[in-house]
């Protein structure tokens, strides 16, 4: 593994461990960002199941013309995820940024999820 991959993996582990300490049974909103798309899901770690998910690859997102590589798409994914989570009865989550900086697309997704009904 390259030094950069090792550093990112360690950062991801460190963030996950701190989230596990403060979660208190709340589901985790996990975000994955690639160069072309963004993915988010609400995970119940106690049961090991995904409660809601959304990504920029979905048909609803592709029809709007947004690629996943911009802030507008991240906002749309955050809003869609929050609507699905609230529909399934989840309102409080712990935000897992996955080692990414809280900036740009990650911040836009989090803000849109908050505006649509999730609290973290």
UniProtKB/Swiss-Prot annotation:
Assembly and oligomerization: Part of the 50S ribosomal subunit; part of the 5S rRNA/L5/L18/L25 subcomplex. Contacts the 5S and 23S rRNAs.
Domain of life: Bacteria
Gene3D superfamilies for this protein: 3.30.420.100
Organism taxonomic ancestry: Bacteria, Pseudomonadati, Pseudomonadota, Alphaproteobacteria, Hyphomicrobiales
Record has Ribosomal protein as a keyword: yes
Ribonucleoprotein as UniProt keyword: yes
Keywords linked to the UniProt accession: Ribonucleoprotein, Ribosomal protein, RNA-binding, rRNA-binding
Chain's role: This is one of the proteins that bind and probably mediate the attachment of the 5S RNA into the large ribosomal subunit, where it forms part of the central protuberance.
GO MF term list: 5S rRNA binding; structural constituent of ribosome
Any GO BP annotation: translation
Listed name of the protein: Large ribosomal subunit protein uL18
């Amino acid at each position: 593994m390259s030094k950069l991959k090792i550093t990112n993996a360690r950062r991801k582990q460190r963030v996950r461990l701190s989230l596990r300490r403060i979660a208190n049974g709340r589901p985790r909103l996990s975000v994955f960002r690639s160069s072309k798309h963004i993915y988010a899901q609400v995970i119940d770690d106690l049961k090991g199941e995904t409660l809601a998910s959304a990504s920029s690859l979905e048909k609803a997102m592709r029809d709007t013309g947004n690629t996943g590589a911009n802030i507008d798409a991240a906002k749309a994914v955050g809003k869609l995820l929050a609507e699905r989570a609230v529909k399934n009865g989840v309102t409080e989550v712990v935000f897992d940024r996955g080692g990414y900086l809280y900036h740009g697309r990650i911040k836009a997704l989090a803000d849109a999820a908050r505006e649509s009904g999730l609290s973290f």
